């Protein structure tokens, strides 16, 4: 196996060298230009990207500039600049691949890159997490980045839903400033945001609840477009064995049973 690796090279290494590294260079070359943008010019980039999509350009066409924009927004909003390896991770996720990242490599920050890029379609982008805390902390921590680019961020948990708003201050407080800026909203509003954070269970149960509704106005979710799954091995393999089951009171079916039971003997 080692002989074959030496002869043909590692597939991942070839992918990084041929597909990702040139894109990283393109993004890095844009950094000086984006650093000079005012906040007003930076937020206008989102509208310009959407206009270019409407005229026929693809997300892949926009990727270098969109990643450069989110990198600059992150540097200004939370003081963190995406490293080259994080740019590569973002590209892999955008392409639908699994990106394994070690602890400390900043996967929360990596996700902002493909989430922003795919949110430009205005069809919604989801970040699926293992628990409610990670959903709230992720949306609250990354929310200022998206906000600087004019992108709304929603979060849905077991007992609440909200939209990130830096001007809103939760009266209860949560011991972490990243959790204090979610303005309460309906689940429909949270899903209507450009980017929505939530757990696999909440997304799944809301999908099931929507299938029990009779009126379109009662639906929570919109059509599904793009999602990134955190801890993908746990969620799609380990937890996949646990069924999501939702039920309703059976009084109506019991009444129907009695009615049909009376008809059958006739």
Model-derived regions: residue spans:
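Conserved P-loop NTPase motor core
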Residues: 1-266
């Amino acid at each position: 196996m080692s002989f074959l690796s030496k002869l043909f090279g590692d597939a991942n290494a070839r992918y990084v060298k041929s597909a990702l590294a040139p894109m990283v260079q393109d993004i890095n070359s844009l950094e000086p230009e984006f650093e000079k943008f005012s906040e007003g010019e930076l937020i206008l980039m989102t509208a310009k990207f959407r206009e270019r999509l409407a005229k026929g350009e693809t997300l892949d066409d926009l990727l270098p500039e969109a990643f450069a924009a989110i990198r600059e927004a992150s540097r200004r909003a939370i003081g963190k600049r995406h490293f080259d390896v994080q740019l590569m991770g973002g590209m892999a996720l955008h392409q639908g691949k699994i990106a394994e990242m070690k602890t400390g490599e900043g996967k929360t920050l990596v996700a902002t890159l493909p989430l922003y890029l795919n949110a430009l379609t205005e069809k919604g982008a989801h970040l699926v997490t293992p628990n409610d805390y990670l959903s709230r902390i992720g949306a609250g921590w990354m929310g200022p980045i998206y906000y600087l680019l004019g992108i709304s961020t929603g979060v849905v948990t077991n007992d609440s839903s909200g939209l990130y708003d830096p001007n809103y201050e939760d009266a209860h407080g949560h011991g972490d400033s990243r959790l204090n800026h979610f303005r309460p909203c309906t689940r429909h509003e949270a899903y209507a945001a450009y980017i929505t954070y939530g757990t696999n269970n909440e997304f799944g149960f809301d999908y099931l609840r929507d299938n029990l509704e009779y009126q379109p106005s009662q639906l929570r979710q919109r059509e599904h477009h793009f999602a990134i799954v955190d801890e993908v091995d746990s969620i799609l393999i380990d937890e996949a064995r646990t069924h999501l089951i939702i039920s309703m009171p059976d009084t109506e079916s019991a009444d129907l049973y009695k009615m049909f039971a009376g008809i059958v003997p006739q």
